[in-house]
Amino acid sequence: MNKKLEQLEKFKTNDKNPVYSTTNTGVSLSDDANSLKAGPRGPTLLEDFVLREKITHFDHERIPERIVHARGTGAHGYFLSYKDHSKLTKADFLSKQDKKTPVFIRISTVQGPRGSADTVRDVHGFAVKFYTDEGNYDLVGNNMPVFFIQDASSFPDFVHAVKMEPQNEMPTGGSAHDTFYDFCGLKPESAHSVLWVMSDRGIPISLRHQQGFGVHSYRFINQEGKSTFVKLHWKPLSGTCSLLWDEAQKIAGKDCDYHRRRFWEDIESGDFPQWELGAQLLDEDLQKKFDFDILDPTKLIPEELTPVIPLGRMVIDRNPDNFFAETEQVAFCVSHVVPGIDFSNDPLLQGRIFSYLDTQLSRLGGPNFNEIPINRPVCPFANNQRDGIHRMTINKGGASYFPNSIDKGYPLLKEPSANKGGFRPYPENISGTKSYDRSETFEDHFSQATMFWNSMSQHEKNHIIAAYTFEISKCSRPEVRTRYVNNILVNIDSVLAEKVAKNLGVKIEPTSTKPIKKIMVKPSPALSQPNLLSGDIVSRRISVIIEKGVDYDDVINFKDDMEKRGAMVMLVSSTLAQVECSGGEMLSPKGTIIGNPSIFFDAVYVPKSTEEATKILSDDGNFLHYILEAFKHLKTIAFGGSVSVIKELLRLPQDHGLLLGNGYKDITEQFFYSLAHHRVWERESKVSKIPA
């Protein structure tokens, strides 16, 4: 157990222990199911303080949800530094090899409220709180390295535009509506980020299969006081991959908690999600070679120009004991930094430094939110802040000011030093004329958007075209659709614009006479998800369909083989009743075909069975739909023995992800190979006629 979990234990209670029920003030209760009345059928009495306390507390159980990132899930873990990075930063948690620091992670969607679905198309928040020996450090980022706006002044406008429309509070959990595309069509700096959302990055297959980014440029300050600008990255050890859009929509309807459930179950089973933290180092000489400004949050730095240097590994290994107390009350603030880490002049970052702190005051009830157990640092903390709503600390002593002599000057100030000193901002030289002007280096809104488009594989480009078509078609105003195609997409790529325009019935207008600032940028292979797979099947989910007459050995041997490779295998049947195998053995399914559809899995295996079992499956419409849907979603499917006739029954065209054999031995290696490649992309052009 790490320091943070040990600290939280002091605040926990176990109501399963043999204790008596009491009021909030400790008075034992003799009745907690009936109100106090004047006779069995008489009116309820005002003096019933037990009833009033219970109802009053219930009436105030909810707190304001986050304005953005309301829908999220979190868990505990630890960060392990790979080595002593003190030449880069004096931050203590990176100061020596194998130094272990407790963390809490929260991953979220942006647009929807707490009750929205997990698998909507959206940016995903990726926030990590490090409980370091020098105080809390919050790295508050997203699963995309760029943002929609360049200056914090536009943040309320952006959020108002993407959120549900004010007249009808729709749509929930999506950006496919007029106000968002009206804003973005008039705000070309959003082009790059919207393109990322329309890509497969907007619909990750699971929370553990997405990258995280710090978005902004930060400073690392080393022991000598030298500053280096950095961009911070989280790379999942599980690889990076996504759902298909049709799949994501269906999952949202059949299990709106799909992402959080999968994350929770992985942790409970001991299959811990892991990410590697890395940094791109941006010294001044290197910055001069860039055609963009590192202070512009709508830009990324291609890894081909500046590699990501690994710093350490994060392991998420424990679920919360109470969602509200931990995940809902955790407060991430961009302003939470430690010695060795400092800010840049990114104008969006500068506004976030204020905004994240400010929003906690209303959401968590005042300035003492850092005293809530999940937010407390694990190192000693003391200052002259006093009182306020929900104060938990009892301060002794007569002085609450600095300087003082009454309490011998305590708490003392710590001088900045090379090691474990007090925080002092980097002494940056600043000069300039006060103005609202934006730097000319921020004016190129399309070069990197085009780079991202050109970096995509063909199937990724097809998905982007389909996503724009779906989203913009939901806009009811023709002028919004026309403007976005002509103001934004035309300036990203002509093929993209032409195909989306055709799908929307929009006419591409003659090229504007107003020139746009744009340069050629080489494609970046590091941006394409097929290049980011892990090469294994760890944490992948496989459905094994069993009915009466299935071959017991084939099921067990396949299951054992896949689980040894790190996959999760579930036996699925038409009912939850035990299934009698061909040799008389019994198997217990863990899910039903209807309750655990193919969209919940990455691959399907139909084991060797008797002709009776094959007949049962062939006559089961739910099963046939199951296979058709898995095929349409480009998943690996294998049939063993006589059940291979189902392939012919469904007229499925052959490809390398549709496997036939006499049992698990014939298909195991091909199954692994196909699943490790995530989806059978060559199949995508063939599935348009599949009625699933």
From Swiss-Prot:
Residues annotated as binding heme: Y356
A Pfam short name: Catalase
MF GO annotations: catalase activity; heme binding; metal ion binding
Cellular localization per UniProt: Cytoplasm
GO biological process assignments: hydrogen peroxide catabolic process; response to oxidative stress; response to reactive oxygen species; sorocarp development
Main location: cytoplasm
Enzyme Commission number: 1.11.1.6
Cofactor needs: heme
Temperature sensitivity of activity: Thermostable. Still active after heating at 65 degrees Celsius for 15 minures.
Catalytic reaction equation(s): 2 H2O2 = O2 + 2 H2O
Annotated catalytic residues: H69, N142
Alphabetical list of CDD domains matching this protein: catalase_clade_2, GATase1_catalase
Factors inducing expression: By srfA, in response to late development signals.
Broad EC category: oxidoreductase
Origin superkingdom: Eukaryota
Family membership noted in the UniProt record: Belongs to the catalase family.
Function as written in the Swiss-Prot or TrEMBL entry: Occurs in almost all aerobically respiring organisms and serves to protect cells from the toxic effects of hydrogen peroxide. Its accumulation in prespore cells affords the spores protection from oxidation during prolonged dormancy. Required for normal developmental timing, possibly through a regulatory role in differentiation and morphogenesis.
Protein name: Catalase-B
Organism lineage: Eukaryota, Amoebozoa, Evosea, Eumycetozoa, Dictyostelia
